[in-house]
UniProtKB/Swiss-Prot annotation:
Belongs to the SecA family. Its EC number is 7.4.2.8. It is a peripheral membrane protein. It comes from Deinococcus radiodurans (strain ATCC 13939 / DSM 20539 / JCM 16871 / CCUG 27074 / LMG 4051 / NBRC 15346 / NCIMB 9279 / VKM B-1422 / R1). ATP binds at residues 85, 103-107, 508. It is found in: Cell membrane; Cytoplasm. Its main location: membrane. The lineage of its organism: Bacteria, Thermotogati, Deinococcota, Deinococci, Deinococcales. This is Protein translocase subunit SecA. Pfam families: P-loop_SecA, SecA_DEAD, SecA_PP_bind, SecA_SW.
Amino acid sequence: MFRVLNKVFDNNKRDVERIIQTVVKPVNALEEETMRVENLAEAFMDLRRRVQDGGESLDSLIVPAFALIREAGRRSIGKRHYDTQLIGGAALHQGRIAEMRTGEGKTLVATLALAFNALEGKGCHLVTVNDYLARVGMEEMGLLYRTLGLTVGLANRELSPAEKQAAYACDITYVTNSELGFDYLRDNMAQSKEALVLRADTPLHYAIVDEVDSILIDEARTPLIISGAAEKATDLYYVFAKLIRRLQKGEPAEPGVRTEPTGDYTIEEKSKAVHLTEQGITKIERLLSLKDLYSPENMDKAHMITQAIRARELYHREKDYIVNAEGEVVIVDEFTGRSMPGRRYGEGLHQAIEAKEGVKIENENQTLATITYQNFFRLYDKFAGMTGTAKTEEKEFLDIYGSDVLVIPTNKPVIRVDSDDLIYRTRMGKYAAVVGEVQEMHATGRPILIGTASIETSEQLSSLLQQAGVQHAVLNAKFEAQEASIIAQAGRSGTVTIATNMAGRGTDIMLGGNDEYIIGESIEQQLGVSRYAPEVEAFIKAISREDPAAEQLGMQIPGITLDFIRQAQELHRATVEDRQRVRDLGGLHIVGTERHESRRIDNQLRGRAGRQGDPGSSRFYVSFEDDLMRLFANDRVVGMMDRLGMDDSQPIEAKMVTGAIEKAQARVEDRNFGIRKQLLEFDNVMSKQRDEIYAQRREVLLGPDEDIEETTEGMIGDFVDSQLAAYAPIEVSHEQWDIEQLRSAMVEAVPALETFDFESLRVNSPAEAQDRLLSAVADAFDARKEELSPTMMNSLARYVLLQVVDQHWKEHLHGMDVLRQGIGLRGYGQRDPFTEYKFEATNMFNEMIDALKADVTKFIFRMQFGGA
């Protein structure tokens, strides 16, 4: 095992060394020469011409390009890329996942790969987890790009389609993962070329995904879905929410304990499954006056009752969701603690939760378009990612995305001290210990960040700290608006911050606080001037550098006063002093209140301390009532505590327990990886179908008129062939052909064939019969063109193709949803669910294509152009 680990580390070291020799050293050697370049934009555009017109490969220009980008950073925003950041930039260009510690400047690193790949002129995307980070990244780095002659844009949900088109037409576009995914789906529902927002020629060329583990692993199981309301009664959800209160939760059968399950239903927390017992089924049938709960007409009711029980037993307010001020049930992301407005649980679960909470039930939705992040990002010609924690998930990145992880060396050594876990018997015993440690450390003035796994825990700890008289700030899904402001100051002396999981991720915690953030925020609030205006940025940088020109630069900002400038200078001095004070105290201290299912999430929390060589420390507090320990840890450890007579206030620090935690985490990670991999296998079936439909649709939307005509004629020809295969197959004699059915089907689609002599086809060979019928249909098509004019005919064909494809695809998605929900039952019949799913999905798709071609034929020949 150690040999394997050593090999992994050796490979990483070798790859880093290769980049140092081929990129970093040559770029450094070019630095002085590059500093003498007067016009960086002109020099950079010359490189672009060499790529686009001169045929030079992008890779061959990485050294001069990186040298120019580094110099642009130094001149424009006062930030020169470190050597380690050059390594990160090269890794991102290579399409790898760059693991970079918190505080190593991922935002600046991305500029290297984005600007470099922008030389191809095909569009580059920087994908972030929220609008705030996208806007800040674009505004902070915008000047660097513009110094190189590049354009930069921000695509968010507030923009009109025309504004979004302009944003995506830029060389570099900052956008959130969800907005980008939805824009892709909306583009594939567009009814005109003008409605497309992504580039028509290269919509998905190159992307860097920030916090890549959050998007491609944590959110991999949550598909992006565009829905339309489907007509379905919702009152039953209220009925079943009341009905299940009369049911009794029982225990499952267990060898040696009980042979039959007890109660009306049992639950399985690990898989979030609910199982009705025979007793429960009988009771429900009696309460609802049903003969058979599982008869075809009652299947919906059985499903809704199961979801009502899941909503009651397995989904909890303040942990899995919140109810906002408008009375809407809003999902809380289990990994980040952020609320996810607009996202809804599927299969009626969201409606069941709404009924449980007594709020208005929204109609169930019908899927119009859907894609998972797993398959979406694989559509890019090239994509890369960056995060502080990726190595633990390298196998998944490699297996699913074909991307390996490169651990980038830190610019300065990490000196953070990570203490062993303290394990308590109960949750309250653990909380008491956390409060005690916070009080003790708070008394010294050290800043403390407390990480929690849920909103419920954060509010419980907040209450305990209030009782203990400890002032603190709370950061969770309920307070996202203040997120950046709270995190920016979480490193000041005496500050205590409670953060749900990784709320605030993406914003650095700077020791002593972030004076630049406060000054910028004050200018925006008091003067109404953007902190990213060039004159404001120049003033803030001058304050930070203690530049004598700060006063002169400040007076160029409209509305600013000398008194404001003096206050800004004093704030900077106080921040510098506090930074040193916090360093002397030991830096930021991290308190983890629970081990997460994933080691990666724990590492993210730890990584908030010790940035850029700062001191810091961390410790996790664990109890045997925590979800991870309760569901997955070994009962022997609890027995050991009992035998030792340990009470709630006594912790243990035992390697056996730490080992049990790590094994539990590894088991959960393996299980979750397995689930994501299975999801991908199923989604790959849908993905191939989606790619085929979207490619066909795009050809129709963007193709020239002659291509539309060719596509239409091809579909009509395929329809004719399918009718001949059905009613006049080659393998049977002419006498057995069902000419009446053939005539009926063809005349229904092509009225002009009313006078065609179908009976005469019997005297022909199958090939001749096909030629005669196709020829008659072609004549009808030409007559239709003449009737409408070629231009109107092409407009009709384009309209019909888009409408028919969209309608059939929507219905197909619904059918696939139903198939996916029921396919698990095949496992009970000793059949492989995936094989069955793939087989049936393929048949359904082929049937859809046949039906689609039939409808296109009917509409082309029957629709009046005025109706189009």
